[in-house]
């Protein structure tokens, strides 16, 4: 799967109350901080899109993002297998990508995980 073509323009974030919305708020301000801390403190990887809590107003309906806990869909490539983003559940709109040279490497790695994600 190739995520390199994604851009912020492809991803629409708004309130769950608007039927045209593609995404709503995360569960709480505390959880928003947890998601952002995991993204910020990663030891490797390049953010392709997202990576910062949403600020300002929605282009769809003018909703003020400060009235909720909004984190955009975030895609990060080349994340180290030792990074917490691989080892822990983010429970948020974050996808981490890693290229494996040989298919067998994937299975060896997956079986070392605490969670099968």
Name each region found by the language model.
Residues 1-114:
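NAD(P)-dependent aldehyde/semialdehyde dehydrogenase
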């Amino acid at each position: 799967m190739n995520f390199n073509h994604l851009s912020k323009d492809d991803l629409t974030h708004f309130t769950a109350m608007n039927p045209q919305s593609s995404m709503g708020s995360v569960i709480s301000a505390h959880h928003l901080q947890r998601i952002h801390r995991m993204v910020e403190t990663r030891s490797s990887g390049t953010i392709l899109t997202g990576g910062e809590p949403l600020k300002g107003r929605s282009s769809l309906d003018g909703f003020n993002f400060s009235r909720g806990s909004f984190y955009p869909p975030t895609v990060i490539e080349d994340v180290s297998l030792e990074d917490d983003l691989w080892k822990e559940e983010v429970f948020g709109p974050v996808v981490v990508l890693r290229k494996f040279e040989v298919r067998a490497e994937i299975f060896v790695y997956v079986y070392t995980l605490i969670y099968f994600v």
